[in-house]
């Protein structure tokens, strides 16, 4: 009997890994099949989360929910149209000019490094700047070819992009109207000690995270544009927007954005690149040490190692969108588990929390 019991335990533990791996693989295949639909739903859900604060503001002004949602979405659509007419053409023009100028920048930087390499060889210094430059230039040129191909496909897919944008707005409209009913219906299928903490944690993590990240990204973009204009940085608007969009990636986004812009400017002017890197880093420190703690606090409570793992998993599964939603999902899981253990230890906590948060 003891041997059979031990054998059963070994079989159970031995099958756990393959079963979990098979389930993960099946979920990955399902995601790949419905990737476009899931992406649209995720973007619409994020937009609904962000706009829900504005909807509540208009509801306090004695508007009905439908009227408030309609006003907010019309204002959002108007803002997007204004940005699309004024800002997007300028960004496309600057991006096109940047792609055209980078080969000339590469040639100029190659010539400068050749003279520096000759100076190092004349003094018997063990430097191979020319070889390093050749490898870096090859990598940049290959990436430029990829970007050019992606730009062409983006131009060809403009119509489908407009259709997707319309679908996102329509989905966000119905999510703002009926999302609570749908979510509460799904939560009811879960046991109360799981469903209630999950709903609270999801709402807190996603709303706090996305609103904070969006405001911090807007801050970086708005502050860096005049700084870059004063420094006479070429493509100031484009570079500031690149850093601002990179800010949406938690933990490492600012470093990636500033590093990319500084690297591109190094090809043209070392002094200008240094000024840009220093000024952007100072603004990043202001953001991280002054604004971010006030806006975000430590609501996720996640270890930095867990954040990095979540970012890598999100990147592998869903690309940029996965990176953006990885941290709030991880924070939701942790918050739910913490609340579940708390409700087990303290009776009646869930019934006290729900009316204040939902």
Model-assigned labels for residue ranges:
Residues 44-48, 172, 241-248, 252-255, ...:
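Hydrophobic transmembrane alpha-helices
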Residues 154-266, 270-276:
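Alpha-helical transmembrane segments and their immediate interhelical loop/hinge regions
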Residues 273-358:
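Hydrophobic alpha-helical transmembrane segments of membrane transport and translocation systems
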């Amino acid at each position: 009997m003891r041997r059979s019991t031990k054998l059963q335990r070994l079989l159970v533990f031995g099958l756990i890994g393959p079963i979990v791996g098979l389930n993960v693989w099946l979920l990955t295949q399902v995601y790949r099949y419905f990737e476009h639909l899931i992406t649209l739903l995720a973007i619409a859900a994020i937009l609904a989360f962000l706009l829900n604060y504005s909807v509540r503001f208009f509801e306090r002004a004695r508007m009905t929910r439908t009227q408030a949602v309609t006003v907010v979405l019309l204002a959002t659509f108007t803002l997007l149209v204004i940005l699309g007419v004024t800002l997007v053409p300028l960004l496309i023009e600057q991006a096109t000019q940047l792609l055209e100028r980078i080969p000339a920048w590469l040639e100029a930087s190659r010539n400068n490094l050749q003279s520096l390499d000759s100076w190092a060889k004349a003094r018997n210094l063990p430097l191979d700047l020319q070889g390093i430059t050749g490898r870096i230039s090859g990598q940049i040129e290959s990436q430029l070819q990829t970007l050019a191909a992606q730009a062409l496909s983006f131009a060809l897919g403009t119509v489908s992009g407009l259709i997707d944008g319309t679908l996102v707005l329509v989905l966000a409209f119905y999510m703002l109207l009926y999302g609570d009913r749908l979510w509460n219906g799904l939560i009811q299928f879960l046991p109360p000690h799981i469903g209630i903490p999950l709903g609270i944690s999801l709402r807190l993590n996603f709303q706090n995270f996305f609103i904070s990240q969006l405001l911090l990204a807007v801050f970086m973009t708005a502050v860096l544009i005049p700084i870059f204009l004063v420094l006479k940085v070429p493509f100031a608007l484009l570079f500031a927007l690149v850093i601002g969009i990179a800010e949406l990636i938690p933990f490492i986004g600012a470093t990636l954005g500033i590093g990319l812009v500084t690297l591109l400017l190094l090809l043209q002017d070392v002094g200008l690149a240094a000024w840009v890197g220093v000024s952007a880093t100072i603004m990043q420190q202001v953001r991280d040490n002054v604004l971010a703690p006030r806006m975000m606090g430590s609501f996720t409570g996640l270890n930095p190692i867990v954040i990095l793992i979540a970012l890598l998993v999100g990147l592998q599964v869903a690309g940029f969108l996965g990176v953006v939603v990885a941290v709030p999902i991880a924070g939701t899981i942790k918050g739910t588990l913490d609340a579940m253990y708390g409700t087990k230890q303290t009776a009646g906590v869930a019934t006290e929390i729900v009316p204040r948060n939902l």
